[in-house]
Amino acid sequence: DLENFADVSTSILKTLEKNGYIKFYEQTVERNPFIHKVIDSSSKLNLTDEQKSAYDAVEEAIDDCMNSEFLLFGVTGSGKTEVYLQLIEKVLNIGKTSVMLVPEISLTPQTVDRFIARFGQDKIAILHSKLSVGERYDQWYKIKNGEAKIVIGARSAIFAPISDLGLIIIDEEHDSSYKSEMIPRYNVKDVSRYLAKEYNVPIVFGSATPDM
């Protein structure tokens, strides 16, 4: 590839290297899906009494390593996301990783931007169907190496290679897209419950119209 790019033969390149004119080396370059984003940072907001009550209940489960389930009930714009953000910050502060699942249709740039504004790009990995194969590989590698402590994605993100899971959040938990009809068929809730039990961590389900 280099020979074609420079339009020279391999022998010429080796001669230049031998005489010290050039140097060959390998370097990993991450394909970053956030590369063009410039987002102002944001500070956490004061929680209302209801939000604080919900936060405190989940925080206790995180501190006690309890495999518990919580339903955060509220319509769009009621402040569920701020509770998510502060719970993720709690998990981040104890050195563990959070998984934030959202329906594919809701995984908009605006959704991701809010998390980047709070936590920065370096701590976040994103997994969804619109990533290139290379981008997906790099995000997966970032998670496996422990560089990303916040994983945001659609249903397949539940299979991310996390070794220090601290919290699972499933937003819009009633959404039918959390059930995969393709082989292998699976329900994100079932997989989440299994992982939460294995790691002794809580799951937060968020919805305005909870699945019965």
PLM feature spans:
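Accessory, non-ATPase domains that flank or precede helicase/AAA+ motor cores in DNA-metabolism machines
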Residues: 1-191, 195-207
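Conserved phosphotransfer active-site motifs of two-component signaling proteins
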Residues: 210
